Swiss-Prot record:
Localization, UniProt: Apical cell membrane; Basolateral cell membrane; Cell projection, Cilium membrane
This protein's encoding gene: UMOD
Domains: entry comment: The ZP domain mediates polymerization, leading to the formation of long filaments. The core of the filament consists of interlocked ZP domains which assemble into a helical structure. Each ZP domain consists of an N-terminal (ZP-N) and C-terminal (ZP-C) region connected by a flexible linker; the linker allows the ZP domain to wrap around the ZP-C subdomain of the preceding subunit. The heavily glycosylated N-terminal part of the protein (containing several EGF-like domains) forms branches which protrude from the core and are involved in pathogen capture.
Name used for this protein in its record: Uromodulin
UniProt-annotated stretches for the region D10C: 174-293
Residues covered by the EGF-like domain: 32-66, 67-109, 110-151, 294-325
GO cellular component: apical plasma membrane; basolateral plasma membrane; cell surface; ciliary membrane; cilium; extracellular space; membrane; side of membrane
Organism: Bos taurus
Chain residue ranges for the region called Internal hydrophobic patch (IHP): 456-466
Amino acid sequence: MKCLFSPNFMWMAAVVTSWVIIPAATDTSSAKSCSECHSNATCTVDGAATTCACQEGFTGDGLECVDLDECAVLGAHNCSATKSCVNTLGSYTCVCPEGFLLSSELGCEDVDECAEPGLSRCHALATCINGEGNYSCVCPAGYLGDGRHCECSPGSCGPGLDCVREGDALVCVDPCQVHRILDEYWRSTEYGSGYICDVSLGGWYRFVGQAGVRLPETCVPVLHCNTAAPMWLNGTHPSSDEGIVNRVACAHWSGDCCLWDAPIQVKACAGGYYVYNLTAPPECHLAYCTDPSSVEGTCEECRVDEDCKSDNGEWHCQCKQDFNVTDLSLLERRLECGVDDIKLSLSKCQLKSLGFEKVFMYLHDSQCSGFTERGDRDWMSVVTPARDGPCGTVMTRNETHATYSNTLYLADEIIIRDLNIRINFACSYPLDMKVSLKTSLQPMVSALNISMGGTGTFTVRMALFQSPAYTQPYQGSSVTLSTEAFLYVGTMLDGGDLSRFVLLMTNCYATPSSNATDPLKYFIIQDRCPRAADSTIQVEENGESPQGRFSVQMFRFAGNYDLVYLHCEVYLCDTVNEKCRPTCPETRFRSGSIIDQTRVLNLGPITRKGGQAAMSRAAPSSLGLLQVWLPLLLSATLTLMSP
């Protein structure tokens, strides 16, 4: 029997068993002292026991704490579907996606990148179009590109403009404003021969100096203008109303006035000068010449119906032939129906073409005479206030419009023998609140002047109207109504910059006396919002335009008061820097704000008519809201009469 263990040979079998102990995850751990707790854990000492627990937003046993990624754990965060969860150390945040901004009231609200400069990356010439969470850029007509980069293409620009390179981009420009200068004495046709070659020219140029300011229009002898084959304009120069025209420049050599030619463009500019889009000549030595008889023009800037002409070396603006008329019926009339004035203008050039060297013009009241205006053209104008009476103006009115009529008398001498020319003209205005007050004899109205620093003085008016059309104000200093009637109150703003300011009714209330500070007040509008408890109150317009409107059913104060006075505190709201349109919740609480009596309009008295039903609340008029000061009818007629 063999021995299992031998001193010479021995097998050893060893069995090793490994144990891995994984501690169970717990929220707390016992510790000897608080110093053993993790920096993101909380230490609790209860008698002899000390425990460590991870703070909210962390996970672990208190001795070791790691950040909990709430965004990765379902239900660990409360971000809505429209927001993105972003994990932070010990917490998380809900952020809006790109193109949205977090609002405490509306959640993720779209950012209008087009509203403010710098928010979009659109090209300066492009139009920015806002979308939900994004925006797009569109190049203007005639331009190519993705909107972030826009370039014109040859022939794509409007009349009188050309596509030229400025820096790294192609843009549409007026060559009268953007060009280079050529001031070289040797370009004169009177200068002798030379070896200049305009091979480097290209683009828009203007000739200046004593050598002449424009290309000659006739063939130039060879060996002039400091070159061998002088170049001249084969054609005539355009007038300023033709814009950019195509022409050919010819080079004279070997007995041929147009042996070589080059395409060019020409434009006549206001002020009596020309600009040329020159191209390099096809050969050398060729150079562009100038006409020395065309000295530098000294016209003041001519109008669109004038050309700068030289007469015996003197430059002045002359009427263009294109604007001449031969018949009085073709005389152009410009009628402007303004807010406060009516102006009729006649073209001075056309009057001159009809033989009016001197113009005498006046209205029904001859004290209202004509005067000269220099704008885009020279005009002879007369002005009358848009009121009944001044300058002989007559006002007529129907249910929808107020019309102001007058007659212009025209003569070319102080005395009239042969012909008396009359031009009848009229402006019609839709009846809105302002026009209605202006055309009423004694409207029930209150007025207040408000001065805004740097922007002028404004006048605010408040009036009482008979219907929801707000076109028939009550007449006189008082009115009597039953409690079944409705009060239609309109406020309106005049003067100053109406494009910037709107009228805001902050507090409107009634009192039984004319005292606006009477402690007995019934608020119709308070803190910009209508009284919610009174269902008869309707605010049609407030903080949206230069006018405000509201209505309320007539009432009387308890205590046998028969008089009602209306008071409105108004505020001029700057739409550039303020939010003007009120936002009114369904439930409102009285704020007790102090009323500024310097901004209060007062109206009344309105007397209660006992027992008798006055007008009930009318249905909305078919007129709707008429836009302020929009002239719907502009008319002018021409009548020739013998004396």
